[in-house]
Curated annotation (Swiss-Prot):
Transmembrane domains' residue ranges: 13-33, 48-68, 87-107, 112-132, 175-194, 198-217, 222-244, 302-322, 343-363, 374-394
Pathways per UniProt: Cell wall biogenesis; peptidoglycan biosynthesis
Membrane topology: Multi-pass membrane protein
The enzyme's E.C. designation: 2.4.99.28
Gene Ontology cellular-component annotations: cell division site; divisome complex; plasma membrane
One Pfam assignment: FTSW_RODA_SPOVE
Protein's name in the database: Probable peptidoglycan glycosyltransferase FtsW
Gene: ftsW
């Protein structure tokens, strides 16, 4: 006998209907555990889990390949960065198990504490942070370096999700409700720009705006804030000579291929060498220290060179499906009025996809370089740990949503 779960009433949120439409349109492509709304036998999203493992595996393989030349030069060990990345993966796995055991109510309760802790760490890094290429973004703990900016992303999105639960009506009906999150962004932006780290500021700003849109904020508020945001970004670019060089290099990197346009031209050469099937794993020429940051910010170019167009498309599809699953999980959580979980899941999907878009766009010459990692693929301990934690939060949200539906069915069948 086929059992069915009762349909639960959707919250009426402006912007939520768009999320439902996108999710429904793509639902046949990626269905997670292939369950329908009438079945809740499998209590976790298998597709999301395997996509996460796949991206982490691709990341480890490509970090190993791309980092061998620089590892040999810096430490006389070609596998130095691969070993560290392996340690980060083990730590991420341990952290993932812990995250899966924590109910979402825990993150909601301590969201403000997490944000306060992130602000304190951002202050500490300005005082005792280790500097790399003129940017003080890391706190050196010996075996591990912490990048507070990565923790700030997750803690802010938890805080904003909780804020939207508490002040949703104020956000929709009052300008003050809309501006309060912008005030938090402003405080974080000041601390981040002091490092400097414009890329993280852009991610925080865009993701927060998207969350407010889903919560039903008025359109004219977005137009005003976006206009102010664009003006602020332009002023910040003009204030720093290195940012001006990045933008001009993005417009025409071949004008100065050995100066400001060097990194981008080398990245484009990597894509050109890759063609359809690539040069083969380990056969990149650009990673031989022609392309700076080949194992971090520009690892996507090495994927293009070694695995070709096919590898690039595969990686992008996997990233897209992870982002879609996040939005779908968020939609289902909002359907049963798990608002904190729903908003947080949507924010993770937007964050994941936007950061990947900026990284890929910078490597392909479509966007100025921002120093953002490719989620789960680029080398970077803090990024890997925080991103994997965010993915495990999605799995926990999905589990709680399915559990709620199953319990609703049991109650309804009595």
């Amino acid at each position: 006998m086929r059992l069915s779960l009762p349909r639960l009433k959707m919250p009426r949120l402006p912007g939520f209907s768009i999320l439902v439409w996108i999710s429904t349109a793509l639902k046949g492509w990626v269905m997670g555990s292939r369950e329908k709304d009438t079945d809740s036998l499998i209590m976790y999203d298998r597709t999301l889990l395997w996509l996460t493992f796949g991206l982490a595996a691709i990341g480890f393989i490509m970090v190993t390949s791309a980092s061998m030349p620089i590892g040999q030069r810096l430490t006389n060990d070609p596998f130095f960065f691969a070993k560290r990345d392996g340690v980060y993966l083990i730590l991420a796995f341990i952290l993932a198990i812990i995250t899966l055991r924590l109910p979402m109510e825990f993150w909601q309760r301590y969201s403000a504490t997490m944000l306060l802790g992130s602000i304190i760490l951002l202050m500490i890094v300005l005082v005792v942070g280790s500097s790399v290429k003129g940017a003080s973004r890391w706190i050196d703990l010996g075996l591990l370096r912490i990048q507070p900016a990565e923790l700030t992303k997750l803690s802010l999105f938890c805080y904003i999700a909780n804020y939207l639960v508490r002040k949703g009506d104020e956000v929709r009906n009052n300008l003050r409700g809309f501006l309060k999150p912008m005030g938090v962004i402003l405080v974080l932006a000041v601390l981040l720009l002091a490092q400097p780290d414009l890329g993280t500021v852009v991610v925080l700003f865009v993701t927060t705006l998207a969350m407010l849109f889903l919560a039903g904020a008025k359109l004219w508020q977005f137009i005003a804030i976006i206009g102010m945001g664009i003006s602020a970004v332009v002023l910040l670019i003009l204030a720093e000579p290195y940012r001006i060089r990045r933008v001009t290099a993005f417009w025409n990197p071949w004008e100065d291929p050995f100066g400001s346009g060097y990194q981008l031209t080398q990245s484009l050469m990597a894509f050109g060498r890759g063609e359809l099937w690539g040069q083969g794993l380990g056969n990149s020429v650009q990673k031989l220290e022609y392309l700076p940051e080949a194992h971090t910010d520009f690892i996507f170019a090495i994927i293009g060179e070694e695995l070709g167009y096919v590898g690039v498309v595969l990686a992008l599809l996997m990233v897209f499906f992870v982002a879609f699953r996040a939005m779908s999980i968020g939609r289902k959580a909002l359907e049963i009025d798990h608002r904190f979980s729903g908003f947080l899941a949507c924010s993770i999907g937007i964050w994941f996809s936007f950061q990947a878009l900026v990284n890929v766009g910078a490597a392909a010459g479509m966007l100025p370089t921002k120093g953002l990692t490719l989620p789960l693929i680029s080398y970077g301990g803090s990024s890997l740990l925080i991103m994997s934690t965010a993915i495990m939060m999605l799995l926990r949200i999905d589990y709680e949503t399915r559990l709620e539906k199953a319990q609703a069915f049991v109650r309804g069948s009595r």
